[in-house]
Regions:
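Short, solvent-exposed loop/turn segments at secondary-structure junctions
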Residues: 3, 29-30, 73-77
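Charged phosphate-binding loop/patch that engages nucleotide di/tri-phosphates or the phosphate backbone
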Residues: 129-147
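Unchanged
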Residues: 40-63, 74-131
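N-terminal first-folded block
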Residues: 12, 18-21, 25-33
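A beta-strand edge to alpha-helix "cap/lid" segment located at domain peripheries
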Residues: 1-4, 112, 131-136
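Conserved N-terminal beta-strand and adjoining loop/helix that marks the start
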Residues: 1-20, 89-94
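A short, polar/proline- and glycine-enriched secondary-structure boundary/capping micro-motif
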Residues: 31-35, 116-117
Length: 147
C-alpha cells in the first residue's frame, strides 16, 4: 500500500450552530462535506495558506483568526485501483472576522479543482456519514456530538 502525507490549513467559519463546508470532488473525500482550506504550498506559512484557500474556495478575505487545533487522521482509499493510505495533517483556525458577504460569495455553485462550492450547514442537522474524517473530528472538538 502506498503511504502519503498531506499537510494543510483549514478554516472553521461559524455562525451559531452553522458552519461553512465545501462539497468535495475527487480524492479520498469525494462526495463528502469538508472544511474549506487546502495544501500548504512550498514557502507558505500555515496562515498564508489559510487566507489564500478561503479566498479561493469561499470568496472571503480573512481579517482575524485564531489557531483552534492541530490534528491528524489516517485515511485509506482506492486510487485508480491501488490502495493508498494518507496521513492527513492539519492546522485548524477559527475565523473571527472576514470581509465580503459569505452568503453571496458561496451561493455560486462553480466547480473548481476540488469542490462544488461552499455554504453554511446547520451542524445539528448533519450526519457523520456526510462529513470527511477530518471535518468530523474538528466539529466534535467544537462540542457537537453525532449518533
Amino acid at each position: 500500500m502506498k503511504e502519503l502525507k498531506h499537510l494543510g490549513s483549514y478554516g472553521l467559519i461559524l455562525d451559531n450552530d452553522n458552519i461553512v463546508l465545501i462539497s468535495k470532488v475527487g480524492g479520498p473525500y469525494d462526495g463528502k462535506l469538508d472544511l474549506p482550506g487546502g495544501t500548504i504550498e512550498f514557502g507558505e506559512t500555515p496562515e498564508e495558506t489559510l487566507k489564500r484557500e478561503l479566498e479561493e474556495e469561499v470568496g472571503i478575505k480573512v481579517i482575524d483568526y485564531e489557531l483552534f487545533d492541530g490534528n491528524s487522521v489516517n485515511v485509506t482509499w482506492n486510487h485508480k485501483g491501488q490502495l493508498e493510505s494518507i496521513h492527513h495533517i492539519g492546522f485548524f483556525y477559527k475565523i473571527n472576522k472576514y470581509e465580503n458577504n459569505i452568503k453571496s460569495n458561496i451561493a455560486i455553485d462553480s466547480i473548481n479543482d476540488d469542490s462544488r462550492g461552499a455554504k453554511f450547514y446547520n451542524i445539528k442537522e448533519l450526519k457523520k456519514e456526510q462529513l470527511s474524517n477530518i471535518a468530523l473530528l474538528e466539529i466534535e472538538k467544537l462540542g457537537y456530538k453525532f449518533d
